[in-house]
């Protein structure tokens, strides 16, 4: 059985706008290439392209998914946050939260990103695939119930697991977040 790979180019259309996070260069901090935001679609496109040119792409079971529903999101995030996120994404006039910006289309991209993770989890739990990888963007591992943080807008894995729990009842899983940095992670 091959590895299922969940990807949708539309997830990469999310933009942080002109916001650029800069860190002092030196020590172990490399100068940024250009003025793009640290969390940007090119790193994910590069990963996908490497899979293709290496020939590994041909051994993957490439799949797509539908966006998560608002009902799915509300199992993890608060109604005020979801309302603010949807409004901000529709007009792009505010930057609620701690370390991220929401622009037009952010809600749709984040919902689709979480949808990829939800489908990956559902397919593994149903044993229709043995293992899965979701190339999901924007990421979700730092998002909190009341706010997006750390460039994460929706808590993708939490949304996927709560959706699975709602469908299957009791669910026992382990989540390993391998993200090497200080703070929320």
Predicted feature descriptions by range:
Residues 1-176, 180-185:
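HDAC/HDAC-like amidohydrolase catalytic core signature
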């Amino acid at each position: 059985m091959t590895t299922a790979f969940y990807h949708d180019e539309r997830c990469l259309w999310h933009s942080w706008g002109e916001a650029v996070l800069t860190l002092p260069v030196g020590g172990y901090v490399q100068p940024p290439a250009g003025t793009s935001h640290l969390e940007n679609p090119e790193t994910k496109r590069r990963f996908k392209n490497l899979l293709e040119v290496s020939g590994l792409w041909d051994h993957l079971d490439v799949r797509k998914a539908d966006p998560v529903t608002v009902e799915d999101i509300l199992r993890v995030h608060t109604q005020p946050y979801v309302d603010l996120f949807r409004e901000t994404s529709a007009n792009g006039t505010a930057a609620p939260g701690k370390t991220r910006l929401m622009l037009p289309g952010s809600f749709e991209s984040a919902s689709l990103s979480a949808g990829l993770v939800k489908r990956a989890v559902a397919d593994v739990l149903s044993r229709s695939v043995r293992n899965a990888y979701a190339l999901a963007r924007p990421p979700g591992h730092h998002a909190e119930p009341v706010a997006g943080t750390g460039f994460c807008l929706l808590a993708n894995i939490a949304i996927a697991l709560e959706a699975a729990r709602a469908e299957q009842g009791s669910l026992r899983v382990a989540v390993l977040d391998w993200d090497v940095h200080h703070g929320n992670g």
